[in-house]
Amino acid sequence: MGSKMSDPLVIGRVIGEVVDYFTPSVKMSVTYNSSKHVYNGHELFPSSVTSKPRVEVHGGDLRSFFTLIMIDPDVPGPSDPYLREHLHWIVTDIPGTTDCSFGREIVGYEMPRPNIGIHRFVFLLFKQKKRQTLLSAPLSRDRFNTRKFSEENELGSPVAAAFFNCQRETAARRR
């Protein structure tokens, strides 16, 4: 393990702006279109993240349950993110050692649509104390607060996280 300062989640300000420092205890992989892997801080184009990704939990067991949250902390733009955080997806009751398709989608996937600047899109995985821990879906996608949601639903600190950068594409950049 490297120092906290070399952690891409610290460098990318996910730790600090979105969640407090935590030690990952579960491995999570995020893949779009079966070939575009999410690596912390790497860029993906909006055209490659239109459909929901496969998110695999490599930890726990079938008796462990996890909640996945995807947010954009940079709305409407990174220089003035007054709508922070924008909620893109929540899936609960994901059994350990499986993927999010085995969970319960509380908030449907919304594809990234960054308008101004480079946005971070963050996946956070929390271990639930038991199945069906979460009460209900948030009323709004804007001004979502991961820390508050985690506290209200007794999720504690994340057990895994990943993020990618994304910015608006010009027609010439679309692939």
Curated annotation (Swiss-Prot):
Main localization, broad class: cytoplasm
Superkingdom of the organism of origin: Eukaryota
Tissue expression: Expressed in vegetative axillary meristems but not in the main shoot meristem.
Subcellular location: Cytoplasm
Cross-referenced Pfam families: PBP
Induction or repression: Down-regulated at the onset of flowering.
CDD domains from the UniProt entry: PEBP_euk
GO CC list: cytoplasm; nucleus
Transmembrane residue ranges: none
Keywords (A to Z) from UniProt: Cytoplasm
Sequence similarity: Belongs to the phosphatidylethanolamine-binding protein family.
Chain's role: May form complexes with phosphorylated ligands by interfering with kinases and their effectors.
Designated name of the protein: CEN-like protein 4
Organism annotation: Nicotiana tabacum (Common tobacco)
Organism placement in taxonomy: Eukaryota, Viridiplantae, Streptophyta, Embryophyta, Tracheophyta
Gene: CET4
